[in-house]
A protein has these predicted regions:
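Extracytoplasmic
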Residues: 14-48, 161, 308-313, 440
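Extracytoplasmic gate region of multi-pass secondary transporters
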Residues: 33-34, 234-260, 289-335, 339-343, ...
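Extracellular/periplasmic helix-loop-helix junction of adjacent transmembrane segments
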Residues: 36-70
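Conserved MFS/SLC helix-loop-helix module at the cytosolic interface between two early adjacent transmembrane helices
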Residues: 71-110
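Helix-breaking motifs and short loop linkers at transmembrane-helix boundaries and internal kinks
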Residues: 84, 105-111, 122, 139, ...
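Helix-loop-helix hairpin linking two adjacent transmembrane segments in secondary transporters
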Residues: 150, 154-204, 217-263
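A late C-terminal transmembrane helix in Major Facilitator Superfamily
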Residues: 342-343, 410, 414-451
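C-terminal transmembrane helical hairpin of 12-TM major facilitator-type secondary transporters
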Residues: 357-409
Length: 492
């Protein structure tokens, strides 16, 4: 890639590539739920047979996954700061592979939800440690690029999941019949475990000649035993909370949206608990106005990501996109755009990093264009147009801007945070952001069931992104002077 041939392959390039693999399998595992549920709804199989409100229930399953995912965001970053980013990253991928395999083995709605929540709990610790590990081991001028390149795994995972899962179901139908929905979980879970072993072997920092590594630094140390113990304890508590809310809500006859709102309320309650118990560490992350605005900005970002990530195949199919595989092909163009958008956004972000509000201004432009493109796509399909080529182009272009803005925002948040707190900050950012992911699948599904069309959910998506633009414009970025140097930084 950029200047790679000139400088040769560096250790941080290897780290970017390995974390790309981590993102790839993480997103295949989580995005698989949407196409599988779409298949189950259409064919009325398993626990979706004779259900009156299938999209609402399917969306609720997605929201329960993201509730677990959301709750582990800050603990994941906190554990990374304590036991090492690398240890938590690798534990996350192993956990995801096992949870995915078990989802395919079990039967029944409750067991399905249980292992989707467990998947969310395991994958919830990945994000903050991945971002922090890249920031620690990359040269300052290449942090945005590194974050963007690693995140292309998101795009490839989204595309592979959107296209590959329907294909795997079709492949399995002749020998598994209505249990064909299980087959993708076996395949993706196995691939995830293979990647976990690769990360265990190769995701290691490299000593720089003349630079003494700080073995106590979270970017260097890797305490797997303690990391797994505390990760298990946090997950056990949150699993009981999430499943408890689900069982009590169902017994009380609450709607899917009501359950999602209750799950969302766990976010401020967890922040309050953390503030009371770890005030000295949490207060700076909440008192920084610019960081807080970025936390809120990521709510519509996650809403958009999982509105499309969960329901895109169903959206395209409902608006005349053909059979399941044909609709999946059109929908995949949105995720495919990230292969260009993520590294391009990261590179542009680095180019303007030294300018006053440089990253902020780029982020505002990308968000503004994306907002317009969301409304254009909504208007096109709501007027009855369904040309698959046109829809594919629209989804690809909007995806280009959507994925490009994310490494810009991540690098901006990193600029605003001291080195020792990056893991906790990214954990806090994604904790708040996952409010959007928790609400998006179920609210969108309920609105779809009540209106009979995906038109209103699309318009709601655009309105939320417009609100995100307002938040970005209120940010005034100022870099934090770092007091410690990572090996990548010390050598330059």
């Amino acid at each position: 890639m950029w200047k790679l041939r000139k400088e040769g392959l560096q250790r941080y390039h290897t780290i970017w590539g390995l974390l790309f693999l981590g993102w790839f399998v993480s997103y295949i595992d989580r995005v698989a739920t949407g196409p599988i549920i779409t298949y189950m709804i259409e064919n009325e199989v398993s626990f979706f047979a004779d259900v009156a409100n299938p999209h609402a229930i399917g969306g609720l399953i997605g929201s329960l996954f993201f509730a677990g995912f959301m709750l582990m965001q800050f603990p994941g970053g906190y554990l990374g700061d304590r036991f090492g980013y690398r240890a938590i990253i690798i534990l996350s991928i192993f956990w995801a592979g096992i949870a995915t395999l078990l989802t395919g083995i079990v039967g029944g709605l409750i067991a399905f939800i249980l292992f989707r929540v467990l998947l969310g709990l395991g994958e919830g610790v990945f994000y903050s440690n991945d971002r922090s590990y890249i920031a620690y081991h990359s040269p300052p001028k290449k942090v945005g690029l590194g974050m963007g390149i690693a995140l292309t795994g998101v795009s490839l995972g989204l595309t592979a999941g959107t296209l590959g899962v329907p294909y795997l179901i079709t492949l399995a139908e002749p020998f598994m019949n209505h249990n064909a929905w299980r087959f993708p979980f076996f395949v993706t879970g196995g691939i995830t475990l293979i990647v976990a072993f690769i990360l265990l072997k190769y995701l290691k920092p490299k000593a720089t000649p003349g630079v003494a590594l700080d073995s106590s630094s979270p970017g260097i140390k890797a305490q797997f035993g303690k990391g797994f113990l505390y990760m298990t304890l946090y997950s056990a508590v949150f699993l009981v909370i999430v499943m408890g809310i689900y069982f009590v809500s169902v017994k009380l006859g609450l709607s899917s949206i009501a359950i999602a709102i209750i799950l969302t309320a766990l976010c401020p309650l967890l922040i309050l608990y953390l503030y009371i118990t770890k005030k000295s560490e949490i207060k700076p992350l909440l008192a920084n106005k610019n960081l807080f605005l970025l936390y809120l900005f990521f709510i519509p970002i996650m809403w958009h990501l999982w509105f499309y990530g969960f329901w895109s195949v169903s959206i395209v199919k409902d608006f005349g996109g053909g059979a399941l595989m044909a609709a999946a092909l059109v929908a995949s163009f949105n995720g495919l755009a990230g292969l260009i958008g993520f590294p391009l956004g990261g590179k542009i972000s680095d180019l303007v990093s030294d300018r006053p509000n440089g990253r902020r201004n780029v982020l505002a432009v990308l968000t503004g264009v994306l907002t317009i493109l969301i409304f254009v796509f909504a208007a096109y399909v709501m007027m009855g147009h369904n040309n698959p080529v046109v829809m594919s182009i629209m989804l690809f272009v909007s995806g280009l801007f959507f994925f490009a803005l994310q490494p810009v925002a991540h690098a901006l948040a990193s600029d605003l945070t001291p080195e020792k707190s990056k893991g906790s900050m990214f954990g806090m950012l994604n904790l708040v952001a996952e409010i959007g992911a928790v609400l998006s699948p179920v609210v969108s599904g309920v609105v779809r069931d009540s209106t009979g069309s995906w038109g209103m959910p699309l318009m709601l998506d655009g309105a939320l992104m417009a609100a995100g633009l307002v938040l970005v414009l209120a940010v005034s970025s100022q870099k934090v002077r770092q007091t410690t140097l990572s090996p990548a930084k010390a050598g330059r």
